[in-house]
A protein has these predicted regions:
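Non-catalytic substrate-recognition and accessory regions of acyl/acetyltransferase enzymes
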Residues: 8-114, 122-225
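Residues forming the Rossmann-fold NAD(P)(H) cofactor-binding site
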Residues: 118
Length: 225
């Protein structure tokens, strides 16, 4: 276990978000917890999911799905946290109603044990940056917790931000004529009105490296289907 932590520390650099480092360290303290990356589809559009799993055999890619019941135990009428995370982030290609969105992926849904969501988002952003142009928040609904994640990305110097435009269906004026950057701004307008372009939900985010994915792969904590 000490060796795994040393290997992880070799991947760290000054730019990495400290919350991500903390979550990686917590994962590596557990002997068999990793992240499953798998492909799906929805209405003819490709989806990708990033989910915490228990790795049974990394060589054969055998795993078991974690559930909320894995995150705590009941003892002496008390609820005790096990330290095992549960959760997922699902992303998808932009739907027609979304707009082109600069070719980025769009978050379709997410749920995670408190404190372990940002790591899944980090993996999703790195993957989407290598397999597309980046990642943008759900265009209509973002939870308060997820909103803090996006606000953090907006302030990080190692994350590239690209402004997305409104679509013709949005009740605000578009910023430019070209449509390639058009992306539904329902959530941005709902929280910021005419200043929607200043909302963290109005951007597409990307990352130039895969340091977190590389570290998790090196530790045998990524399963890809």
């Amino acid at each position: 276990m000490k060796k795994l932590l040393e290997n992880w520390n070799n991947f760290l650099n000054e730019a990495i978000d400290p919350r991500i480092q903390k979550q990686i360290d917590a994962i590596l303290e557990l002997p068999d917890i990793g992240v499953l990356i798998y492909k799906g589809s929805m209405m003819g559009f490709t989806t990708m999911s990033f989910r915490y799993v228990r790795i049974v055999d990394k060589d054969t890619k055998k795993y078991s799905i974690l559930t909320p019941q894995d995150t705590f135990i009941r003892k002496d009428r008390k609820t005790i946290k096990t330290g095992i995370p549960n959760g997922y982030v699902e992303i998808r290609e932009p739907l027609r109603a979304d707009g082109p969105c600069l070719g980025g992926w769009v978050v379709g849904g997410s749920l995670a044990t408190t404190g372990f969501g940002p790591l899944l988002y980090e993996v999703a952003i790195e993957w989407s940056s290598q397999n597309g142009e980046g990642l943008t928040p759900d265009r209509k609904s973002v939870s308060t917790y997820a909103g803090r994640v996006w606000a953090n990305y907006m302030s990080r110097s190692d994350i590239e931000k690209k402004q997305l435009d409104a679509t013709k269906e949005d009740p605000v004026q578009r910023l430019t004529r070209p449509v390639a950057d058009d992306c539904s701004q329902v959530k941005s307008v709902a929280v910021a009105g005419e200043n929607w372009m200043n909302s963290p939900f109005s951007k597409m985010y990307s990352k130039s490296n895969t340091e977190v994915l590389d570290a998790l792969r090196a530790a045998g904590r990524i399963i890809e289907e």
